[in-house]
């Protein structure tokens, strides 16, 4: 595992020692090399997990998320160049250092064997993200957004720490690899019910569950482009990853505790999709669509069948790449039009025809067009939910229709129609931006050829 952690750490001195002209090229290329070497992790054999040491392990659930984490750093650096062009050198270097630190924490979160270590790293990701949002966001509301983000996440996570200490005292270990073989079921008692809530709430806030999702649109809208990308692509997946890991301990309580949360998620999925149809703010629309997609993942994880787990893992990876790409596209519009309001940025197809092609591709993957992995994930979730309860097909079908509606609404509003006069003299799309979009699209298209590598531990 150190062959990914140490090169990531060495990005720090590389950043601070690079010349002014080379700072972006050096860090982007080095991080791209790290992300390409991380593909070696896909070669897993034996008992389907790689035990690197007592501290780090990786199995077929954490590997896709790990590779996604490393793949995203060069993309974030590419996306942030224009945003930081007016900053002085020290601030650029500080920004890049924050992104590197965040990647380091995320790698350790996804490979931790010990639950307490996982918890510490899970909380540590909060710090760089908060600094990125509150220091480099666009409007002054970013401070409010940072406050929301901090308090929602902390309030959700503190009961988890208490629950983990309790588990440590009763079971004598917090090692994932040992807890897999823990066979003593939890009896139904009030204390165990509260423990279930404490364990799950931290991850439900992070996902976020409908009702606890208010920090997400705020944080997304106010964050700079790199902050939005890493939030949508990876930090939301931490919740799903944690839920899938910790449900091992919580059976059979999950069987009856899951009902209200599944209902809430199914309802929230429809509600947030409908909210998307009423949005005027482009980034806000993409943020709410994230909530709706993650509600599907919550439902899938709580049903706890092999198919739903496969669907949840596939959907997490697919959504990570798709929403990150949509945020990049929204940012490229924002850098030219200087407004996130969709009505002011309409008719861009005539001015930026290649960007319109990327918009079309991103919207189609967002609405889960076959043969994308978004569709594979959604189908698995829909089928497993249908076998759990037939009536859910109404909500699932409705959600798919509304998702298609708001994706096309977003595409048509931004790309079609007559463009407003104040955007006659905008810049054409840069090669950097097109490379950024193609690096988002490439994994999505390649994974649709071979989706089994991201179907998680139960494939």
From Swiss-Prot:
EC number of the protein: 7.1.1.2
Cellular location(s): Mitochondrion inner membrane
Keyword Mitochondrion: yes
Catalytic activity entry: a ubiquinone + NADH + 5 H(+)(in) = a ubiquinol + NAD(+) + 4 H(+)(out)
Record carries keyword Mitochondrion: yes
Transmembrane segments: 22-42, 60-80, 98-118, 147-167, 196-216, 224-244, 256-276, 284-303, 308-330, 351-371, 391-411
Annotated membrane topology: Multi-pass membrane protein
One cellular-component annotation, GO: respiratory chain complex I
Keywords carried by this UniProt record: Electron transport, Membrane, Mitochondrion, Mitochondrion inner membrane, NAD, Respiratory chain, Translocase, Transmembrane, Transmembrane helix, Transport, Ubiquinone
Top EC class for this record: translocase
Example of a GO biological process term: electron transport coupled proton transport
Superkingdom of origin: Eukaryota
GO terms, molecular function: NADH dehydrogenase (ubiquinone) activity; ubiquinone binding
A Pfam family hit: Oxidored_q5_N
Family the entry assigns: Belongs to the complex I subunit 4 family.
Self-association and partners: Core subunit of respiratory chain NADH dehydrogenase (Complex I) which is composed of 45 different subunits.
NCBIfam families (UniProt xref): NDH_I_M (TIGR01972)
Functional description taken from the UniProt entry: Core subunit of the mitochondrial membrane respiratory chain NADH dehydrogenase (Complex I) which catalyzes electron transfer from NADH through the respiratory chain, using ubiquinone as an electron acceptor. Essential for the catalytic activity and assembly of complex I.
Listed name of the protein: NADH-ubiquinone oxidoreductase chain 4
Origin species: Ovis aries
Originating gene: MT-ND4
């Amino acid at each position: 595992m150190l062959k990914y952690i140490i090169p990531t750490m060495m990005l720090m001195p590389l950043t601070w020692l690079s010349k002014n002209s080379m700072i972006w090229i050096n860090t982007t290329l080095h991080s791209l090399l790290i992300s390409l070497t991380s593909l070696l992790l896909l070669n897993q054999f034996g008992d389907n997990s790689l035990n690197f040491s007592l501290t780090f392990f990786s199995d077929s659930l954490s590997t896709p998320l790990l590779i996604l984490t490393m793949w995203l750093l060069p993309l974030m650096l590419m996306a942030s160049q224009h945003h930081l062009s007016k900053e002085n050198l020290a601030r650029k270097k500080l920004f890049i250092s924050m992104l590197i630190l965040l990647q380091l924490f995320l790698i350790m979160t996804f490979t931790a064997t010990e639950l307490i270590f996982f918890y510490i790293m899970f909380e540590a990701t909060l710090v760089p993200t908060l600094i990125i949002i509150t220091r480099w966001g666009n409007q002054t509301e970013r401070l409010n957004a940072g406050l929301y983000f901090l308090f929602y996440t902390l309030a959700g996570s503190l009961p988890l720490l208490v629950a983990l200490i309790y588990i440590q005292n009763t079971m004598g270990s917090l090692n994932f690899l040992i807890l897999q073989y823990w066979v003593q079921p939890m009896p139904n008692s009030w204390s165990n019910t509260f423990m279930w809530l404490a364990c799950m709430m931290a991850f439900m806030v992070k996902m976020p569950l409908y009702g606890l999702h208010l920090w997400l649109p705020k944080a997304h809208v106010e964050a700079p482009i790199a902050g939005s990308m890493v939030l949508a692509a990876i930090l939301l997946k931490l919740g799903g990853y944690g839920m899938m890991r910790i449900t091992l301990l919580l059976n059979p309580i999950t069987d009856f505790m899951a009902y209200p949360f599944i209902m809430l998620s199914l309802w929230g999925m429809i509600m947030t999709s409908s909210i998307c149809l009423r949005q005027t703010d482009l980034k806000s629309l993409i943020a709410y669509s994230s909530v709706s997609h993650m509600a599907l993942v919550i439902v899938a994880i709580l049903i706890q069948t092999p198919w739903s787990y496969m669907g949840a893992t596939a959907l997490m990876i697919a959504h990570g790449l798709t929403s990150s790409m949509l945020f990049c596209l929204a940012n490229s519009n924002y850098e030219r039009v200087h407004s996130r309001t969709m009505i002011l940025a309409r008719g861009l197809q005539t001015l930026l025809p290649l960007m319109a092609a990327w918009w079309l591709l991103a919207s189609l993957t967002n609405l889960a067009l076959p043969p994308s992995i978004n569709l594979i994930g959604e189908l698995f979730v829909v089928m497993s939910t249908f076998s759990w309860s037939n009536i859910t097909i109404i909500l699932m079908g409705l959600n798919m229709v509304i998702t298609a509606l708001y994706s096309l609404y977003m595409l048509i509003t931004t790309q079609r129609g007559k463009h407003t006069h104040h955007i006659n003299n905008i810049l054409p799309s840069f090669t950097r931006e097109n490379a950024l979009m193609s690096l988002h699209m490439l994994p999505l298209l390649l994974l649709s050829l071979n989706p089994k590598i991201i179907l998680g531990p139960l494939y």
